[in-house]
UniProtKB/Swiss-Prot annotation:
UniProt keyword Heme present: yes
Free-text function comment from the UniProt entry: Cytochromes P450 are a group of heme-thiolate monooxygenases. They oxidize a variety of structurally unrelated compounds, including steroids, fatty acids, and xenobiotics. May play a role in the regulation of lifespan.
Family statement: Belongs to the cytochrome P450 family.
Keyword hit for Cell division: no
Top-level EC class: oxidoreductase
Species annotation: Caenorhabditis elegans
Record protein name field: Putative cytochrome P450 cyp-13B1
Keywords of this entry: Heme, Iron, Metal-binding, Monooxygenase, Oxidoreductase
Cofactor list: heme
GO terms, molecular function: heme binding; iron ion binding; monooxygenase activity; oxidoreductase activity, acting on paired donors, with incorporation or reduction of molecular oxygen
Top-rank taxon, per record: Eukaryota
Binding site for heme: 456
Organism taxonomic ancestry: Eukaryota, Metazoa, Ecdysozoa, Nematoda, Chromadorea
Length: 510
């Protein structure tokens, strides 16, 4: 009897604690959606079949530009006020340098000795600053010019493989873009020597990572009790969400590649051979050290990396370089097929600017309308909204709202990108021309890659890759929407937004 009373009292105490936590925003005069007991709004937001970005957009329409919700015991503030976002991403970066985690079993995100999963995307503090400084040269204009031929070779091979669909039958063009982007990033980041479209086993592994549900028991426990995350990790050690599943498979691929390259470079050094810089692995290994001590955040960065750093970098490059660009290409192709008059304008520009079979890097900079097509596609279908989230690491204010340490902030990218206040009455329409004239729009009006110091380091690579692929595709084919083409795309994903399929027809250009 005594034990039952203790359990009842314990349950009542825990229930009371969560009831109090879930008044956090109301006590500050901020509205938001009602959640479930204990877990708050987490269940709704963890559905792979209903991307959270679209649900948050729906909530914004109901509650306004600033509202709050709960992931278990953690208050989350959603913002689509551009001045507040400028504070978040730029003016008060030191208070919000941490990105909101995509994995609730992540380990210490600021520790230099953590597992490779603590990478450029997830890391914080001094470790993030060091990794960012090391990665940035690989995405400079000079570096992009050097790797352009690799991107173009994969793009040509992709379009050649599409020739089988000249028979007038519908096909899922998104699958080709997924193969293309994985091929490119494998060659740039992992040293894959040649194009291997539709022969890369890693494609299915990466696809499954992005399509996995977040409704798993260990994650429920960690959103309920974030302070006991490490205990949860030990309790569920054998659970796939903790072991990693496909994440662990991809990390193993990266680990084998990096360790093999380290051994190769050591052997070359013994023989007196100079190590060439062929890919991102070599770029990072030029700063290789068996052990690194991160200095205090905000100080000068020491450019050194461990093997775990390089493995983590390869891992995040494979994931980020695969999904976002493939999805961007799929959305752009869908919109062009639905708007043939816009496609013709893009084709005319490509025909005029590109004078030979090759599409050079300099050609890319001249394809203004094609660039506008990609940017407009990313406006209508933002793919990486999670890059636009932060966690408060030092108490401060955002606008006139006091933000405690540990509170999470999300930008509602969809509401920004579809705002008639920003983009006019045709905000829901595909109008690439809006990008061709100088604009006085707020810097936070278009943020598909995030903003501020933590803006996606691979943004220029992704845009260049997308334009290269589209230029080669549009030179040879018309993209046609037919009876099998989706009237509305079915969007999936917990971390990024991906179309289930984009069914189009190819028509060879005469």
């Amino acid at each position: 009897m005594g034990a039952i009373i203790v359990l009842v009292v314990l349950f009542a105490t825990i229930a009371g604690y969560f009831k109090w936590i879930h008044t956090y925003w109301r006590r500050r005069g901020i509205s938001g959606p009602e959640g479930l007991p204990f877990i708050g709004n987490y269940y709704d937001l963890a559905d792979v079949n209903k991307p959270r970005g679209y649900l948050i957009h729906k909530w914004t329409q109901k509650f306004g530009k600033v509202f709050g919700y709960y992931e278990g015991a953690v208050p989350v503030l959603v913002v689509s006020d551009m001045d507040m976002l400028q504070e978040l991403f730029l003016k008060k970066f030191d208070n919000f340098y941490a990105r909101k985690s995509t994995n609730h079993i992540h380990g210490n995100l600021e520790c230099s000795k953590s597992e490779p999963r603590i990478n450029l995307f997830t890391s914080r503090g001094a470790r993030w600053k060091r990794l960012r400084a090391l990665a940035s040269p690989g995405f400079s204009v000079k570096a992009l010019k050097q790797v352009h031929d690799v991107m173009e070779d994969s793009a040509i091979n992709m379009v050649d493989l599409m020739a089988k669909h000249e028979d007038g039958k519908p096909f899922n063009i998104h699958a080709y873009f997924q193969e293309f982007t994985y091929d490119v990033i494998s060659r740039l980041a992992m040293g894959q020597p040649n194009s291997e479209l539709f022969n890369n086993s890693g494609v299915e592994i990466v696809k499954s990572i992005f399509m996995r549900t977040h409704r798993v028991l260990p994650w429920y426990f960690t959103v309920l009790f974030p302070q006991f995350e490490h205990l949860v990790k030990r309790m569920f050690y054998n659970h796939a969400a903790v072991q990693g599943g496909d994440i662990e498979k991809l990390l193993l691929i990266c680990k084998k590649t990096v360790e093999s390259r380290i051994q190769e470079r050591e052997e070359n050094a013994k023989l007196g051979f100079e190590n060439a810089e062929n890919d991102f692995i070599d770029m990072f290994l030029n700063y290789y050290s068996e052990q690194v001590e991160d200095i205090e955040f905000g100080s000068t960065v020491e450019k050194k990396v461990t093997a775990e750093d390089v493995i983590g970098a390869c891992f995040v490059f494979l994931l980020a370089g695969f999904d976002t660009t493939a999805n961007s290409l799929a959305y752009a192709s869908y919109l062009l097929a639905k708007h043939p008059e816009k496609m013709k304008l893009a084709q005319e520009e490509v025909d005029t600017v590109v004078g030979s079979e090759n599409v050079s890097y300099d050609d890319m900079t001249k394809l203004k309308y094609l660039d506008a097509v990609v940017r407009e596609s990313l406006r209508l279908y933002p793919v990486a909204w999670f890059a636009c989230s932060r966690e408060c690491v030092k108490p401060t204010t955002l606008g006139d709202i006091y933000i405690d340490k540990g509170v999470k902030i999300e930008a509602d990218v969809m509401s920004l990108h579809r705002s008639k206040e920003i983009w006019g009455e045709n905000a829901d329409d595909f109008v690439p021309e809006r990008w061709l004239e100088p604009s006085s729009r707020h810097t936070m009006s278009w943020i598909p890659f995030g903003a501020g110091p933590r803006q996606c380091v691979g943004m220029r690579l992704g845009l260049s890759e997308a334009k290269t692929a589209l230029a080669h595709l549009l030179r040879r084919y018309d993209l046609v929407a037919g009876v099998e083409t989706e009237k509305e795309l079915n969007i999936l994903g917990c971390t990024t937004t991906s179309p289930e399929a984009v069914t189009l027809y190819l028509k060879p250009r005469i």
